[in-house]
């Protein structure tokens, strides 16, 4: 899963990607976070657009929070384990360490996640009016194989863009995610 500001950090076309979390995210992504045994959060500040969807006490019990800024660790959600460091370096070290262990079969969970994702895609009733998701789907079809950066202002179009365009590389979606500054895009 990803936050709005983290879209593209993990390819949206990857089968293991479930969606964007938070109030503007996909139901399936929020459910995956609620149901997970362990959440490794990398570089997120857990703003109110994210945390409003979760029981903070339950989330805190299964949270490993990685951030380069020590002040962000446990700032919003108490963290079971806090790791201060560069995300790439921490992930490389974590992967090296985890390779020494064997894990249970995750195919059941993976199938559940795929089912959640499929249920999230609701067929839309076709009308003579073109809806925002259809416009964004057409835009995505035109840009998906190109090196394109998308920038938005704040508002409903920002949410639609985050939900309906797929970002497969980092830094391809530029938007104001903090104070919601008008005139950003």
Each language-model region and where it sits:
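Predominant activation on well-ordered alpha-helical scaffold segments within soluble catalytic domains
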Residues: 1-2, 30, 88-95, 133-140, ...
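Conserved catalytic cysteine-centered active-site region
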Residues: 1-14, 166, 184
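General beta-strand structural signal in soluble alpha/beta enzymes
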Residues: 1-3, 41-42, 85, 150-154, ...
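Glycine-rich, acidic loop regions that bind phosphate or pyrophosphate groups
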Residues: 6-110
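Active-site diphosphate/adenylate-binding microenvironment
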Residues: 112-185
């Amino acid at each position: 899963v990803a936050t709005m500001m983290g879209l593209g950090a993990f390819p949206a076309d990857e089968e293991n990607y479930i969606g964007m979390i938070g109030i503007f995210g996909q139901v399936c992504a929020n459910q995956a976070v609620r149901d997970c045994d362990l959440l490794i959060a990398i570089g997120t500040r857990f703003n109110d657009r994210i945390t409003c969807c979760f029981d903070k006490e339950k989330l805190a019990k299964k949270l490993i929070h990685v951030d380069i800024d020590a002040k962000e660790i446990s700032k919003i959600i108490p963290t079971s384990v806090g790791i201060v460091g560069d995300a790439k370096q921490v992930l490389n070290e974590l992967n090296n360490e985890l390779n020494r262990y064997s894990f249970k079969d995750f195919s059941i969970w993976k199938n559940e996640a795929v089912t959640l994702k499929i249920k999230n895609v609701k067929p839309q009733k076709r009308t003579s009016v073109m809806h925002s998701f259809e416009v964004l789907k057409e835009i995505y079809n035109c840009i998906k194989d190109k090196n394109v950066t998308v920038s938005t202002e704040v508002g409903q179009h920002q949410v639609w863009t985050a939900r309906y365009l797929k970002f497969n590389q980092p830094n391809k979606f530029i938007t104001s995610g903090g104070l919601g500054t008008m005139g950003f895009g």
